[in-house]
Curated annotation (Swiss-Prot):
Pfam families: CsbD. InterPro entries: CsbD (IPR008462), UPF0337_stress_rsp (IPR050423), YjbJ_sf (IPR036629). Belongs to the UPF0337 (CsbD) family. This is UPF0337 protein BT9727_0908. Residues 13-22 have a biased composition (Basic and acidic residues). It comes from Bacillus thuringiensis subsp. konkukian (strain 97-27). Signal peptide: none annotated. The lineage of its organism: Bacteria, Bacillati, Bacillota, Bacilli, Bacillales. Residues 1-22 are annotated as: Disordered. PANTHER family: UPF0337 PROTEIN YJBJ (PTHR34977:SF1). Gene3D superfamilies: YjbJ (1.10.1470.10).
Length: 66
C-alpha cells in the first residue's frame, strides 16, 4: 500500500473540506472573493484526492506483481 498515495488522499480531503467551509462562509457573508477561494480549494482538494487514489492503485498493482 502506498503511504504517499494515502497521504495525498488525506491532504486532498482536508483541502476540500477547508474549501467547503470557505465557500459556505463566503455565501453567508456575501463575500464573493472568499466564496471563489473556497471553490478553488475544493477543486484542488478533489484533484489531490484523485491523484492519491491513482498513486495508491499503481503502487498496489506493483506490489501484487512481486
Amino acid at each position: 500500500m502506498s503511504e504517499n498515495g494515502l497521504k495525498e488522499q488525506i491532504t486532498g480531503k482536508v483541502e476540500k473540506t477547508k474549501g467547503q467551509v470557505k465557500e459556505g462562509i463566503g455565501e453567508v457573508t456575501e463575500d464573493r472573493k472568499l466564496k471563489n477561494e473556497g471553490k478553488w480549494d475544493k477543486t484542488k482538494g478533489t484533484i489531490k484526492e484523485k491523484v492519491g487514489k491513482v498513486k495508491q492503485k499503481i503502487s498496489d498493482g506493483l506490489d501484487n506483481k512481486e
